[in-house]
Amino acid sequence: MRIAGVNLPLNKHAVIALTHVYGIGNTTAKTILKRAGIAPDRKISDLNDAEAHAIRELVAEEYKVEGQARGEQQLAIKRLMDIGCYRGLRHRRSLPVRGQNTQTNARTRKGKRKTVAGKKKAARK
């Protein structure tokens, strides 16, 4: 079954499978299934065409998913960088944005370590 250009895994429960679509988390998936009248523990492979169509329609009409959600997020970050606010500067420098420590941690955001050679000990005479 495809939703918003994403193939959903057939062997998983509907609530879990929907989270494979970018922009749909656990809470949103539960809301979609509740509005479509589908039990969250039903497998995707067990859904009939009408139920699949109902999910597709809800997602297409009411939610920003995949490319649209990614694009909006990128525009929001670009706006922060353009206005030159603190958060924008942190994004531009690839540093943590939300106040985390950077002296010892933040390796995910900063990337691999750039090794700097230590001072050489002066030879004794």
UniProtKB/Swiss-Prot annotation:
> NCBIfam families under this entry?
uS13_bact
- Please give a single GO biological process term from the UniProt record: translation
List every stretch annotated Disordered. 92-125
Name of the gene this protein is made from: rpsM
Comp. bias intervals (Basic residues): 107-125
| One cellular component (GO) term of this entry | cytosol
Provide the protein name.
Small ribosomal subunit protein uS13
List the keywords (alphabetical).
Ribonucleoprotein, Ribosomal protein, RNA-binding, rRNA-binding, tRNA-binding
What does this chain do?
Answer: Located at the top of the head of the 30S subunit, it contacts several helices of the 16S rRNA. In the 70S ribosome it contacts the 23S rRNA (bridge B1a) and protein L5 of the 50S subunit (bridge B1b), connecting the 2 subunits; these bridges are implicated in subunit movement. Contacts the tRNAs in the A and P-sites.
